[in-house]
Amino acid sequence: MAVPRRKTSPSRRGMRRSADAIKRPTYVEDKDSGELRRPHHLDLKTGMYKGRQVLKKKDS
């Protein structure tokens, strides 16, 4: 059975755990519609991505 040779220090343990935190999703305001959307994602209401029409506009 594998056993560690040395005790993991609190500093090293903390550095290992630093990547475990769940981060809140970021949102940006769309330039065209003013709606909030995820960065690098298309706007589902308008169907625009990077200034181009990729999907048909959602009729609601």
Curated annotation (Swiss-Prot):
GO terms for biological process: translation. Residues 17-44 have a biased composition (Basic and acidic residues). Keywords: Ribonucleoprotein, Ribosomal protein. InterPro entries: Ribosomal_bL32, Ribosomal_bL32_bact, Ribosomal_zn-bd. GO terms for molecular function: structural constituent of ribosome. Residues 1-60 are annotated as: Disordered. Residues 1-16 have a biased composition (Basic residues). The keyword Hydrolase does not apply. Coiled coil: none annotated. One of its GO terms (cellular component) is large ribosomal subunit. Belongs to the bacterial ribosomal protein bL32 family. This is Large ribosomal subunit protein bL32. The lineage of its organism: Bacteria, Pseudomonadati, Pseudomonadota, Alphaproteobacteria, Hyphomicrobiales.
